[in-house]
Regions:
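Compact, glycine-rich, soluble single-domain proteins
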Residues: 42-55, 59
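HotDog/MaoC-like acyl-thioester-processing domains
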Residues: 85-87, 91, 95-133
Length: 133
């Protein structure tokens, strides 16, 4: 999905990489950068970076159900931080749980590449879809 990596300035600035996309699912990677640190003495990434990745991944997963001219916008988001995210790449995986005509509900899981089976955060994203009519 070149749109995600190349055509959205914020995504390009963050360096987000699409690893896998299929209907109702997305897996994105956020390469580690020192400026993503939240607490350098603890070696932990900033929670806002984790939330940003969750939001983007959730939107991408939902967007797979719609056309290229439809717009997906987050209206509600909850992120539970389960443990500190170490200084390493983050991997986000999003699964669409409900895809309606105008609303989507997505579950997102974030892990570090150093321990891919252990979530550092989980969240729920609710999005509004504005369909191109």
């Amino acid at each position: 999905m070149p749109f995600v990596e190349q055509h959205v300035d914020w995504h390009r600035h963050l360096g987000i990489k699409v690893e896998e996309v299929r209907t109702g699912y997305a897996r994105l990677r956020l390469p580690f950068r020192e400026e993503f640190a939240g607490n350098k003495s603890r070696g932990a990434l900033h929670g806002g970076v984790i939330s940003t990745l969750a939001d983007i991944c959730g939107n991408v997963a939902l967007w797979t159900h719609f056309g290229p001219n439809d717009m997906v916008s987050t209206v509600d988001m909850r992120v539970d931080f389960l443990r500190p995210a170490p200084f390493a790449d983050l991997i986000a995986e999003a699964d669409v749980r409900l895809q309606g005509y105008r609303i989507g509900n997505i579950f997102v899981r974030i892990a570090s590449e150093t321990a891919p089976g252990v979530a550092v955060a989980e969240g729920r994203i609710v999005c509004y879809v504005k369909r191109a009519e």
